Amino acid sequence: MSKMEKRKDVRWSKVFLAAVTTAVLVIAGCSSHSGTNKDSSSTAYGTTANAVTQPANNTGDDNKSITVAIAADPGIDQLDAGAYKGSMNVHAMIYDGLVEYGEKGEILPALAESWEISEDGKVYTFHLRKGVKFSDGTDLNAAAVKFSFERWIKDPANSLNIATAMQSLEAVDDLTIRMTFNKAYYPFLTELSFARPVRIISPSAVEPAGDPNGTFVKAIGTGAWMAESYKTDQEAVLVRNPYYWGEKPKLSKIILKVIPDPQSRVLALQNGSVDLAGGQLGKIPVESLPVLQKDSTLSVQEAPGTNSHFLAFNGNNPVLQDVKVRQAINLAINKKSIVQDLMGGIGKEAKGLFPQTVPYVTEDNSTWYGFEPEQAKALLAKAGYSDTDGDGIVDKAGVPLTLNFVLQESEFPEWKSIGELIQSELKDIGINVKLQVLEPNAYYDTLWKTKDYDLIIYRTYDDAYNPHAFLLSLFHKTGDAPAVVWSDAKLEALIDKAVGTTDLKERQSAYDNIFKKMYQEAMFAAVYFPDDIFVVNNRVKNFKLGYTTFTPVFWNQLDVGE
């Protein structure tokens, strides 16, 4: 029998945001957590033999476990807290941050039980929780936090934007860490809740131990879980961290089973070889949901998401530098048909880059192009295109308008059918589209490195990453490198204004102008706002969706029963 659970909109706490402008902000309290070269051999991980005595309060049944389907190898051997390697979901299970993201987007205590922010927003002082240990039994202290931050800040490839503004990092005493910046940056606390690269790793996790420049050896965090074993491209086994400071997991073990093929994940759910699948862990094909909903052993959980799927344009292509062509592509896409006919009514038509579950996105600034194919044809004509040879494809100076459309389906199985529909719709207005389906690694190389595409379907980030982190990552230059999706100096100036002001009204105004400019210049093609779908075996008890995509499930609460 199918059960539908709706998650509340994830939004910023306006009270918290306004408080950033006050002289001092103190938040205190206790918060339970909710949460390379490879070979095919099995590798053992976990607490070492010479670790200190296991604590007595490690409660739970040592025989309780579940198996979770994941779409890609979790990369346990690369799971450095200070790097963008391995599974983001597993990062969040093994490592804790100083703070965590709450149900309504509020920032809650985690490893830091309280903190203060200076009046000018440039100095943050964090007070660490007492008695916290890493999974190897060593103590969490300010030196370990300093080590962790120095590890990711030193590497531009792994660093967040705020790293360039950090002037000093000081361990004031054993449980106090102070960070000083050369400018105010409102999203800093939110970024500290990210799964990576800001979470805290034990100094003994690298060689030589305690060296920020040391080589990563093993994932040692303060989180509720630690890696016990790992077989590349097959599975990873996570077990309870016996030293965990928060709510003790009810399960003793979580097995992450790598199943790249979406239909194979469906079969594994049906035959009981996996207990849970879905979301960013490993998408469930929409066309399989009716069958799964009728399965009496399974439950389907649905939640409104905070991301969107969209088409990125390659601005290096002279054809796509013409705003009329970009607008025509937008007007040719029937977003209602995508949601109703392809997605089975799951999700919503996109009205911009972000849904209104994202902070600063409002009804007023959510304006986008409708389905107007005749208007699209007229815009192509204004851009100088016509079908001179009667083959149904428009051309200009004898050159047909042909675009290469790149996608992948391992992580997002619906993208292939969406791509085929858009291909057909663009042909209807005279654009020839060639689809290219790539494996995930090749796909991401194409997006981030080679840019060997004209159109590529991608998704925004989720939850705490929106809107600022996604805009900085994809629509803003990094150093001398141009923006990944679309380069525009005026847009970048607006993004800088949004993230640099501590005034809430100024920030909202900056975001309004960002979204307006994106619409006017059709910097991308909006497609749809997906819902998150999970399928769970009914033997799994206490299932509850998490507040972020990197913690999609409250793992510590899960239990099993007959």
Language-model-derived ranges and their functions:
Residues 18, 25, 231, 235, ...:
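Detector for C-terminal structural segments
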